[in-house]
């Protein structure tokens, strides 16, 4: 890579036109790439009035901003000297372009973003309200950073510009508070409906339990009455059997007494007859002896 240096080394003019038409070239391998090489590469996009090479980077000054933007678009990420170039407009904030194999720091993720704190505040109070009423909180919504455009306020009308900004912030906060109150009222209605449904279910369950308890009491009473009736019938049967047995014993005892009386009478009659016969025999024997 060779070339003849024909441009100036001045690339640090502070006038707006020069700043807006200046190109920054980063990640430059200055050990291999020289100033003439840079001029040869970037000269095809427009006339170069200045070029300065430093350790690891360089600046190219064009006459027109249009030429500078064309160079940024055409040569960005081009590999020269074994390294991809990081090219952007010198007068604009440098966008973050991470190198291969490195992690992007978290500070650069949200450097140009502002969080919508009203959004997160309403979400926090809603989740706190749900937790206090025993409801399971929903999963948190994904964080969506909102990029707010920069508003330029003229210095001559500074007071009016500040007032308009304050008014806009008040209107935004008022809108968020009204939306938050509406959301809370909707949630209250939903909670009220759910509580009513739960109360209805509890009442129906209590009614069923009362019916089951009454049925159990009725069945227990009927079973108890049946047991008592069975016991009474058994006792009556036992009493009747006892009475029958006593009557039979009484009858058998009467028959035995009559038999004994009859036997005694017969024996007495037999004794009397025997004694009479003996007397008669004795008398007859005496009469025979006397004759």
From Swiss-Prot:
Disulfide bonds: none annotated. SUPFAM superfamilies: RNA-binding domain, RBD (SSF54928). Keywords: Coiled coil, RNA-binding. Residues 164-182 have a biased composition (Low complexity). One of its GO terms (molecular function) is RNA binding. Residues 182-219 form a coiled coil. Residues 225-257 have a biased composition (Basic and acidic residues). The keyword Nucleotide-binding does not apply. Residues 258-275 have a biased composition (Acidic residues). Signal peptide: none annotated. Residues 21-92 form the RRM domain. PROSITE patterns: RRM. Residues 152-185, 216-291 are annotated as: Disordered. InterPro entries: hnRNP_C (IPR017347), Nucleotide-bd_a/b_plait_sf (IPR012677), RBD_domain_sf (IPR035979), RRM_dom (IPR000504), RRM_HNRPC/RALY_subfam (IPR051186). Belongs to the RRM HNRPC family. RALY subfamily. PANTHER family: HETEROGENEOUS NUCLEAR RIBONUCLEOPROTEIN, RNA-BINDING RALY-LIKE PROTEIN. This is RNA-binding Raly-like protein. It comes from Xenopus tropicalis (Western clawed frog).
